[in-house]
Amino acid sequence: YWQQAHAMDVVIYSYERIKDKNPALAATYKNYFKLWFDNKANNYHHSDSDETGFLNPFTDDMCWICLTLIHLSEATGDAVYINMAKNIYDTHIITRAWTDAKGTGLPWKSDDKSRNACTNSPGCLVAAKLYRKFGGENYLEDAKMLYKYIVGSLLKSDGRVEEPPLTYTQGTFGEACRQLYHITQEREYMRKAELVINYTM
């Protein structure tokens, strides 16, 4: 399921590079996109009550799916993909967030309240990207809320995002910070992006 999202992103990047130079190959790629979408990203946790087919007990997995769906819309201009990402986020990602003295963050699973970087970093990025596409202060507030949770509970002073540091959690949080900077023009976000990416390098 989530591995499908990462593999599909590679195909999308290739599509973006060749779509104007090789229409035949671009058409083949677009067919792959449709097959992946129609097959619900090979969602092995799909239940009969899930009308979208993309819902999953693992919150981080749904965040990865949303990022790929958003990327598909950015690459093809087809709104069906980002509209599904919006649906998944609105109904089954942000609704899982819970609050304690450390702040409000996303749990790893529907039945596991632990809140980690591999869930909250891509979740923050999804919220920021949905805000840039649809507007809606709720998405911006969600992105800021998850950013605040990560900085307050997971980010180390040297730029590590939780232990052990993983390139995908470092990268998604760094990109979420960059997106928030471009939305708000507040330098705090760019400074955090620089800290996180410099540590990763």
Question: What do these predicted ranges mean?
Answer:
Residues 1-201:
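Glycan-recognition and catalytic cores of secretory/periplasmic carbohydrate-active enzymes
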